[in-house]
Amino acid sequence: MKIVADENLAFTDYFFSEFGDIQHKAGRTLTHTDVQDAEALLVRSVTAVNESLIQNTALKYVGSATIGTDHLDIQALEKQGITWANAAGCNAQAVAEYVITALLHLDASLLEQQEKFTLGIVGLGNVGKRLAYMAQLLGWKVIGFDPFVQLDSIENVSFQTLLQQANAVSIHVPLTKKGEHATYHLFDEKAFAALQPNTILINSARGPVVKEAALIEDIQCTQRKVVLDVFEHEPVISEGLLNMLALATPHIAGYSLEGKARGTQMIYEAFCQKFGYDINKRFETQLPACEDYFSGHDLKAVLKQKLSQIYDIAQYDANIRACVKEGKVEQKAFDLLRKNYPLRREWAAHGGPQA
């Protein structure tokens, strides 16, 4: 069997080498010719799996090691009779930890604020519910908005109420353009007008959920602290926008070693189900041991002392800013940052909590 895999997928050889010949390719530039005689295709979100890519191929299975599916033309896949799978929730823990790390980097005193600090979570799926749990471990008040999901553990509110009451808003919705609850440009001029000027905004979901022109106008008016891991016009980022952001990272909020490995394992399991193979591999066997920071210690004390060692978010903010040339970060530089990003470990690897 020929298997074509994105060259940046983690542990592909460990999970798939026994099944056939793996060809590693650059995901963003994958062509019909690359996949024509392949039976399985393994991708990330940078590959648009559409009709022109998959028609008249030998493909029987497409696995995407990602939470989202907006890069997959599911209708075209099903029309061609190709089984598909994604890895919903694979890096949800990593994204939740990214958000808390970003907030504590911007304001370390949040560790002491308990319920005086209100975190508003937009989207209560795999990431949102984990973030809610982790935030509550720190004593924060959590409110959430999701038209499809209600969490018993938090206060569920309307979108408008969340915007008005939250001290920080974190976005965790898929990108949708149709229907009553479409998320494209959910954060537009009207949404920004409802936010308090000192409310922190974090987007680690999908870039176009935030209307960039409205965001720029809002920051100019309010000096709002904004953290972006995703961008409306990604992978190109303007220097003007970058200079306005409190923190910027190149779409790596979910890039933990555990998250990457978990994503590949999930599409491996779906692959095995499709082709009738036994599922007998676990990503945990491939991960090196880490220094234990948390066991037997107070959570907040450890975060105060060790957070930058667990994940030095400021370094990766500096890295993306260093890539600016002629007024912008180009696609090639953006992709290189992602490819060369050293995968951090989740808190649980250091003996810490996990949602």
From Swiss-Prot:
The lineage of its organism: Bacteria, Pseudomonadati, Pseudomonadota, Gammaproteobacteria, Moraxellales. Catalyzes the oxidation of erythronate-4-phosphate to 3-hydroxy-2-oxo-4-phosphonooxybutanoate. Belongs to the D-isomer specific 2-hydroxyacid dehydrogenase family. PdxB subfamily. Pathway: Cofactor biosynthesis; pyridoxine 5'-phosphate biosynthesis; pyridoxine 5'-phosphate from D-erythrose 4-phosphate: step 2/5. NAD(+) binds at residues 146, 229, 254. The active site is at residues 206, 234, 251. One of its GO terms (biological process) is pyridoxine biosynthetic process. This is Erythronate-4-phosphate dehydrogenase.
